[in-house]
């Protein structure tokens, strides 16, 4: 199937990240190239965009979609947790703009073979990068009940995590769990009928939790945000689009930590307190989609965009 993914908050991304001619931008989750396709013309003449994605199919789609930009764009299959090393290997000292569009793409959800969706029966996979060894089937069939409980609770914020984990373990004793349909049926059986009738699909939180664990999503996000100090040029902008509270909390805390102001007396020539103001917030509160965008693209409903800017100069002059 063709790689399709409608970029969310596109107008807001362009306004807040404000790409300019000659700048260097990184789209750390290039997907099908939707955001990049809108950013690139604003970088010309003389600008460049580096796009990253873990998914080989996304990389192929982005290369095809952005081919017209020639040498002004490079698409690489990579995990954004390695961004600093990727830039260093290319001799790039810093970037003017950086965008993260977190989570799973529409293509990955809609392609049954990828095993992300609880809406269709498919092989239980959930790997964002097909070169990964760990699959959802491996997790649900082999991880201890205690570990499954912890993952479903922490990453899915699922109140029925202990029951779901217990039902998974009991079911796999009878036969291996190999499809999304099997797993959905087990989850539905584990959650009491009254709870199933309210709110979202009963499997939503468990599928989210497994996907996050399998792909190391939150660890990768933390690792990438820890590199902002060394990656962003003075005045450089970073934007992160998140889709659930766990991601947004990590982004909010990282931006807050990097916004720590120096507490030294004004007369000191060199900072001795160890606190440095690396980022200043561009958005005081997360930007959310308009009602019109949600109507046009319902999957944008839970999106939140936070943007920050690298300070022009540290107090110690670095």
Curated annotation (Swiss-Prot):
S-adenosyl-L-methionine binds at residues 33-35, 53, 80, 101, 108. InterPro entries: RsmH (IPR002903), SAM-dep_MeTrfase_MraW_recog (IPR023397), SAM-dependent_MTases_sf (IPR029063). Its EC number is 2.1.1.199. Coiled coil: none annotated. GO terms for cellular component: cytoplasm. It is found in: Cytoplasm. Pfam families: Methyltransf_5 (PF01795). GO terms for molecular function: rRNA (cytosine-N4-)-methyltransferase activity. Its main location: cytoplasm. The keyword Nucleotide-binding does not apply. SUPFAM superfamilies: Putative methyltransferase TM0872, insert domain, S-adenosyl-L-methionine-dependent methyltransferases. Keywords: Cytoplasm, Methyltransferase, rRNA processing, S-adenosyl-L-methionine, Transferase. GO terms for biological process: rRNA base methylation. It catalyses: cytidine(1402) in 16S rRNA + S-adenosyl-L-methionine = N(4)-methylcytidine(1402) in 16S rRNA + S-adenosyl-L-homocysteine + H(+). Belongs to the methyltransferase superfamily. RsmH family. Specifically methylates the N4 position of cytidine in position 1402 (C1402) of 16S rRNA. This is Ribosomal RNA small subunit methyltransferase H. It comes from Moorella thermoacetica (strain ATCC 39073 / JCM 9320).
